[in-house]
């Protein structure tokens, strides 16, 4: 008996963030791929236009730094995740802490995480 796409989606929906992260890592290892998005090189004029139009930003944690506890607390405060999930997120760097947020919210979160000792990018 084969599993349908709907059954797979239901299984994903029932998983915690930590379980999804572990599943993605296992899939990357098994299939020899990376879940990182491919970067497409475009013309400089196109990049400038796209940057001007961007209204939603992603806050990416690239490293948790030396003060891991403070970074985990900052992640919990920003995302509402539990301790276990926030710890897993900090250890899975690079990882998106928040996606699709305004520039102001992204800058505020970046400042909070950097003050906690993390290395952060906004994309």
From Swiss-Prot:
Task: Provide one Gene Ontology biological process annotation.
Answer: translation
Tell me which family the UniProt entry assigns to this protein.
Answer: Belongs to the bacterial ribosomal protein bL12 family.
According to its UniProt entry, the function of this protein is described as:
Forms part of the ribosomal stalk which helps the ribosome interact with GTP-bound translation factors. Is thus essential for accurate translation.
Annotated GO MF terms: mRNA binding; structural constituent of ribosome
- Keyword terms of this UniProt record: Ribonucleoprotein, Ribosomal protein
Give TM regions.
none
Q: What is the official name of this protein in its record?
A: Large ribosomal subunit protein bL12
Q: Show the GO cellular component annotation of the record.
A: cytosolic large ribosomal subunit
The disulfide bridges present are none
Quaternary structure and partners: Homodimer. Part of the ribosomal stalk of the 50S ribosomal subunit. Forms a multimeric L10(L12)X complex, where L10 forms an elongated spine to which 2 to 4 L12 dimers bind in a sequential fashion. Binds GTP-bound translation factors.
Cross-referenced CDD domains, in alphabetical order? Ribosomal_L7_L12
Give the species.
Shewanella sp. (strain MR-4)
Gene name, please?
rplL
